[in-house]
Design a protein with these regions (language model features):
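Conserved small/polar residues in nucleotide/adenosyl-binding loops
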Residues: 1-5
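Active-site loop/lid in soluble adenylation, ligation, and acyl-transfer enzymes
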Residues: 6-8, 26
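Loop/turn-to-beta-strand initiation segments
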Residues: 9-13, 59-60
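Short coil-to-beta-strand
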Residues: 12-22
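Short beta-strand segments at enzyme active-site cores
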Residues: 16, 61-65, 111-112
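Conserved nucleotide-binding/hydrolysis micro-motifs of P-loop NTPases
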Residues: 19-21, 66-71, 117-120
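A glycine- and Lys/Arg-enriched "phosphate-lid" helix/loop adjacent to the NTP-binding pocket
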Residues: 24-97
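NTP-dependent small-molecule kinase module
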Residues: 72-138
């Protein structure tokens, strides 16, 4: 289902990532690292502004907050080849941008869950805990 179609359904739609993250975290990070030229970055932000008028914000944004050591541990456990070269510096920059963005998020309801002591992939009890937190917010 595409983002546009999610506005017309009565069912809950779960997305792994929002358009906000691209505009407020990944694009500025690439620009700051010199991997996205300023002109492209400005064009991207202009496109993002246009999209904001077309896409309804989520009814509930769930932010899974994590420390860098926990992120590194999860990445190693997953064992994905394309994630093996992610540097601590890159993760730290993204984490800082996520924290700044989420602190100022005002487009809808926000559920912030610190997952440093939760393993919802391997531990059913942790999974149920997170589900209950989400159900309370919906």
């Amino acid at each position: 289902m595409c983002i546009r179609d999610s506005d017309s359904t009565k069912e809950n739609v779960i997305q792994d990532r929002t358009i906000y993250e691209d505009a407020f975290i990944f694009a500025p990070n690439l620009n700051a690292m010199g991997l996205m030229p300023q002109r492209d970055y400005e064009n991207y932000l202009s496109l993002f502004d246009t999209m904001l008028n077309l896409v309804k914000p989520p009814d509930l944004l769930i932010y899974l907050q994590s420390s860098i050591p926990n992120l590194v541990n999860k990445i190693h456990k997953r064992g994905r080849d394309y994630e093996k070269t992610i540097s601590i510096e890159y993760l730290s920059r993204l984490n800082e941008r996520y924290e700044a963005w989420i602190t100022n998020y005002d487009s809808g309801k926000l559920l912030k869950i610190n997952v440093d002591d939760l393993d919802f992939v391997e531990n059913k009890s942790d999974y149920k805990t997170i589900l209950e937190l989400i159900k309370k917010e919906l």
